[in-house]
Amino acid sequence: MPEIAMQPFNLPAAWRSTDYPTKDTFAIDLEPRHLEALNADVKRFKAAGGGHEDINNETFPLCRIAEDIARWRKEVHTGRGMILLRGIPVEDISLDDLRLLYLGLGSHFGRPVSQSNMGDLVGEVVNIGDKDPKERAYRSSRELMLHTDRADHIAMLCIRPAIKGGLSGYASALTIHNIMLEERPDLLSHLYNGFHHHRFGEQPPGEPVVTRERIPIFSVTDGVPSVIFIRGYINLAVDEGHVTLSDGELEALNYMESVSNRDNVRLDFLMEPGELIFVNNCLILHTRTEFEDSDEPTKRRHLIRLWLREDERPAADGVLIHKGKAGIEKQDGKGTYYTSKTAA
């Protein structure tokens, strides 16, 4: 049984929603000099030639705003666990250039990795599957549970919001842990022991549909805490009959989910055009409410996403296996749609 943290986490990322009455309390308005530096590096990178896979913090150095980026990165990695940057002129920049700018800035927070079988370093968060549960969540309009992704940090840049709904939600995993430590410490052992995850058709060739290893929800390595919470993939492994849950495991999952949705824990707000949020995915859960989309393709909800790896971050073996060194392996001919093997 892994060692369980039996003292509350007293870290900046152990915040509650009541600490941030509005997103204005943690937003940063970009200045002209920030945009000038970003645009200059986009032009320089395009002139040199190269693709998305060639972008990193050396090919996109952003030297003129390096001190600001270092401060923002510190806030994400070891501070609050998230920052909101405002003022990217998404209507005045081509989508191709916007992707370059986004990857270039994001590479200073971590190494961009693939987000699906398609090998996409920039994920298009668009409504392809409506409310179909067979489609990956980020390509649907259905309400999501608070969860983490398979990366150390994530970023979301809003190009267009939905016509109704689609609020972004966040909750500190450290706060959830602290509350459970106070109220139901007996349940934590199940969360530290972890669960087998369904791979949703994204396992490499020759690998099983469900992870061989238990993936810990909470873990601490060299004093550094991590969370992995994807209830949907745990549920799918159960629904297809690959694993069963004990009464204690089910209670622990339900209690964690209930705590995460408390009003004084969960923070919800609307992402508006030109707003970019960086989130420490090792410490912060995120979600999105159900939304209604426009019938006009050019007016539909559109965000773009990054998955970023922080290679130096200590993590348990199960965490490293879950995330992979390069994200989700690209597999030609495969997309983001999965048909469950659950019996009819």
Predicted regions and their residues:
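A short alpha->loop->secondary-structure connector
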Residues: 102-113
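"Short basic amphipathic alpha-helical interaction patches in structured regions
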Residues: 96-103, 170-172
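Active-site environment of non-heme Fe oxygenases that use a 2-His-1-carboxylate facial triad
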Residues: 1-66, 70-72, 78, 83, ...
